[in-house]
Amino acid sequence: MKKIIAAAILLGLLLFLIPMGLRQSRQTELPEDAREELVLPSSGYTLSVLVNGTVQELDLNDYLWGVVAAEMPASFAQEALNAQAVAARTYALNKAGRAAGHPEAELCTDYACCQAWIARETARGNWGENALAYTNKITAAVAETNNEVILYEGQLIDAVFHSSSGAATQDAVEVWGNSVPYLQSVDSPEGEEVPNYYSEAVFPAQAFRDTFLAARPEAVLEGEPPQWIGDTVYTEGGSVHTIVIGGVTVTGAQAREIFGLRSACFTVTPTAEAVTFSVTGYGHGVGMSQYGANAMAQQGKTYEEILRHYYTGVTVENYEPTDRQ
């Protein structure tokens, strides 16, 4: 009887310890990217980049890593980050050497001229406890799309992008006055979940008058604000195409710049005391919406599908940087 009891106790211990061992084993079998930093492969192609006043020679992939990290939140879905990497690569190769503001370098890190860029060490410091995970997501975005670009009829496109749109992106001709076949207005799925999707800018009457007259001194702003605002024409994408202020017609893009609005997708409410702009989205609205890309990725779309949605009639193909004209 004692032997039977001892055997039963031993069997019970084994049944208890074996699952524990299995659980411990599973806990240590973490994905490699959760424990180690991925290695970013070299593109084999070098660009001269103006960084804080100094020209640096950067491998294309190292440059793109800093662009994706600076231009798109690393918390976004992987397919959205991949789409950003392809758009950034295309934009860089198309733009390199053509920016008049810095003849000593092919590109710069000023987002208003080329693309935003951040050093890896700075980005990791900003990400805190998420540094390893986010570093690997950006590395994967660049590596998984290595050499891939966006082409229209065999040529690199001007792969412009922006933060968020209203219900749709804008046709390039409505914003910049030149028609571009692949920069058409398309639906964009982001919405109120986007930070600061809706914003408001309120100008007291005198401040509105001073601001607009500084930009358009020929305007006539007499009486009260309701008399200043004339007809507003909207684009297919829902942004302001033109608006009449003080008898002067300006484009939505010009009004956005004059009044410092987040986008040209706005409505205007004038009262006797003030003029209020109610704004939707952020950015010029042309090309790929970054928050729209993230929404599409969360819906299960691939980065190729995202890019083909936002850039009409394009293809995503492998491309050697030395092939650019």
Model-found features: residue ranges?
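Conserved, single-site charged/polar hotspot
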Residues: 1-325
